[in-house]
């Protein structure tokens, strides 16, 4: 497949930046007022250290111009325009208001000088013969290689799960790369050298999220949108762990966030840790539920797909193309993304634990970070969890999954009634609960989130309500397994009362 006009060599590293100012890291100099025209603008103007104009062209789309303020990465202002990105910076009030940018035109291929007719008559037959021989050898090699691949290919892998679908128009170069013969033996990503090449060709476009780990940016690679998670230096172990898991086990699954590349780069005299994944414009399930109310069939679609992802993590697959069992350890609505087809995929494996039955080896990693206190199971809060038992970690995932089901159910419309989004235990703990706050509510008072009575009026939500209760048993071993949750939800989705929503 091809992407746009032909290009020779690797595309140069692009950088672009449009922000509305950074309240966490204010600039040291005086601020200027700038025109703000971007999807993330909160008004017609913003204030920052300088004003920016960025012109971005995604593959198959018309160029879009964004205006805003900049506080970080001033070195990007010195970048040269390319056929995908051009950026401009200035330092006076509203200096970016009437600025218009253009992209560098794609250079046409230079014409080859004509050859002498007599030389062509002599070399023509010779070259044709050599070409036929080369094609024959190449064809034989290709047939043998394809036969070897078919013998070793894992039956559960499908081509569709390996293609990055960043836009609906045109072909995907990244999809070609992920679908080619150069992927790693695990099938989880690209070889390390290819990963570093891809990482250095990504242009950062806009910051779409911030958290305790760092930032998430939307980037462009050859005109395709990708997500770039930039870890803070104090969270290096999370970056290392997530990179390690993606590069050593088979995690290609529709309901697990697709991994592309990982790299440690130096930008502006500081080290940055990048994790590049597929980009999903709906964002996290947490964000999606705050914006969107759900019909019962959509609530079920989200729940089933999340359960499929968790079941795939928890199961061990044997064989040369297998994977160890994995427990997430930080399952929550912020770590579940909503794809364009309104199915969920699970993200953030920085705290994951791996286990293989053959060696009975429990790989906990070396990360001092702990999970999110609001979603911790009672055995974690009262420090009774068996840290040497892999099943214990899976049981904590199930407790958290029940809380995510509760979040989905609250936003589901039944008889015209729906509640505002609230996090679990919103009515009994503060916004940022401490370990002791959660321990008192969950372990001492033995409280669980209140399940609204209205759920009993709908056959889908009544099943979800019962499932929540079975995820919240105080005895961890009595809780449902991820596989049982998946099968039960699929059975509900195929029941006569509701249409089939999971393909």
UniProtKB/Swiss-Prot annotation:
Limits of the GS domain: 172-201
Taxonomic path: Eukaryota, Metazoa, Chordata, Craniata, Vertebrata
Extracellular side: 22-118
EC nos: 2.7.11.30
Phenotype for residue 225 to C: Found in a patient with pulmonary arterial hypertension; uncertain significance
Disulfide bonds: 34-51, 36-41, 46-69, 77-89, 90-95
Signal peptide: 1-21
UniProt modified residues of type Phosphoserine: 155, 160-161
Locations listed in the record: Cell membrane
Cytoplasmic side: 142-503
Species in which this protein is naturally found: Homo sapiens
Full protein name: Activin receptor type-1-like
Gene: ACVRL1
Subunit (UniProt): Interacts with TSC22D1/TSC-22.
Keyword Nucleotide-binding tagged: yes
UniProt-annotated stretches for the region Mediates specificity for BMP ligand: 73-76
An annotated Gene Ontology molecular function: protein kinase binding
Positions of ATP binding: 208-216, 229
Function: Type I receptor for TGF-beta family ligands BMP9/GDF2 and BMP10 and important regulator of normal blood vessel development. On ligand binding, forms a receptor complex consisting of two type II and two type I transmembrane serine/threonine kinases. Type II receptors phosphorylate and activate type I receptors which autophosphorylate, then bind and activate SMAD transcriptional regulators. May bind activin as well.
Keyword Lipid metabolism part of the UniProt annotation: no
Effect caused by changing residue 66 to Y: In HHT2; loss of receptor activity in response to BMP9; retained in the endoplasmic reticulum
Outcome when changing residue 482 to V: In HHT2; likely benign
Pfam families for the chain: PK_Tyr_Ser-Thr (PF07714), TGF_beta_GS (PF08515)
Swiss-Prot/TrEMBL keywords: Angiogenesis, ATP-binding, Cell membrane, Disease variant, Disulfide bond, Glycoprotein, Kinase, Magnesium, Manganese, Membrane, Metal-binding, Nucleotide-binding, Phosphoprotein, Receptor, Serine/threonine-protein kinase, Signal, Transferase, Transmembrane, Transmembrane helix
Matches recorded under CDD domains: STKc_ACVR1_ALK1 (cd14142), TFP_LU_ECD_ALK1 (cd23534)
Positions annotated as active site in the UniProt record: 330
């Amino acid at each position: 497949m091809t992407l746009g006009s032909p290009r020779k060599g690797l595309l140069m590293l692009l950088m672009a930046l449009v922000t509305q100012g950074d309240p966490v890291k204010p600039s040291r100099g005086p601020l200027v007022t700038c025109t703000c025209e971007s999807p993330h603008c909160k008004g017609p103007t913003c204030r920052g250290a300088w004003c920016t104009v960025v012109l971005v062209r995604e593959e198959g789309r018309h160029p879009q111009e964004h205006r805003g303020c900049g506080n970080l990465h001033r070195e990007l202002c010195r970048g040269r325009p390319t056929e995908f990105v051009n950026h401009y910076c200035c330092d006076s009030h509203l200096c970016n208001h009437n600025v218009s940018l253009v992209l560098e035109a794609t250079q046409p291929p230079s014409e080859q000088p004509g050859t002498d007719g007599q030389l062509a008559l002599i070399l023509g037959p010779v070259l044709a013969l050599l070409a036929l021989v080369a094609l024959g050898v190449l064809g034989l090699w290709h047939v043998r290689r394809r036969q070897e691949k078919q013998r070793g290919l894992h039956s559960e892998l499908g081509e569709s799960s390996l293609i990055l679908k960043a836009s609906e128009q045109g072909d995907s170069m990244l999809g070609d790369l992920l679908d080619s013969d150069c992927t790693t033996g695990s099938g989880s990503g690209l070889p390390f050298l290819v990963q570093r090449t891809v990482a250095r060709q990504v242009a950062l476009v806009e910051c779409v999220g911030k958290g305790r780990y760092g930032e998430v940016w939307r980037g462009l690679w050859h005109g395709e949108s990708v997500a770039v998670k930039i870890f803070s230096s104090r969270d290096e172990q999370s970056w290392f762990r997530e990179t390690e898991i993606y590069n050593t086990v088979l995690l290609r699954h529709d309901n697990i966030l697709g991994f592309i590349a990982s790299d440690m780069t130096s930008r502006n005299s500081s080290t940055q840790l990048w994790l590049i994944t597929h980009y999903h414009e709906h964002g996290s399930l947490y964000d999606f539920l705050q914006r969107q109310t759900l019909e019962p069939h959509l609530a079920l679609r989200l729940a089933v797909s999340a359960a499929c992802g968790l079941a795939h993590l928890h199961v061990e697959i044997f064989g040369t193309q297998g994977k160890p069992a994995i427990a997430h350890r930080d399952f929550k609505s912020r770590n579940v993304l909503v794809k364009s087809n309104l199915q969920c995929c699970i993200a953030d494996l920085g705290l994951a634990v791996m286990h293989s039955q053959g060696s009975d080896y429990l790989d906990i990693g070396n990360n001092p970070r702990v999970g999110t206190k609001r979603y911790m199971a009672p055995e974690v809060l009262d420090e009774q969890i068996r840290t040497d038992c892999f099943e214990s970690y899976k049981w904590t995932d199930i407790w958290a999954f029940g809380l995510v089901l509760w979040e989905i159910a609250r936003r589901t419309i039944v008889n015209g009634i729906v509640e505002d989004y609230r996090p679990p235990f919103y009515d009994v703990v503060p916004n940022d609960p401490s370990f002791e706050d959660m321990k008192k509510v969950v372990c001492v008072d033995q409280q669980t989130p209140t399940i609204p009575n209205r759920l009993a009026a709908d056959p889908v939500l009544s099943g979800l309500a019962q499932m929540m209760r079975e995820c919240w048993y105080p005895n961890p071993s009595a809780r449902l397994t991820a596989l049982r949750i998946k099968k039960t939800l699929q059975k509900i989705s195929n029941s006569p009362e509701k249409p089939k929503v999971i393909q």
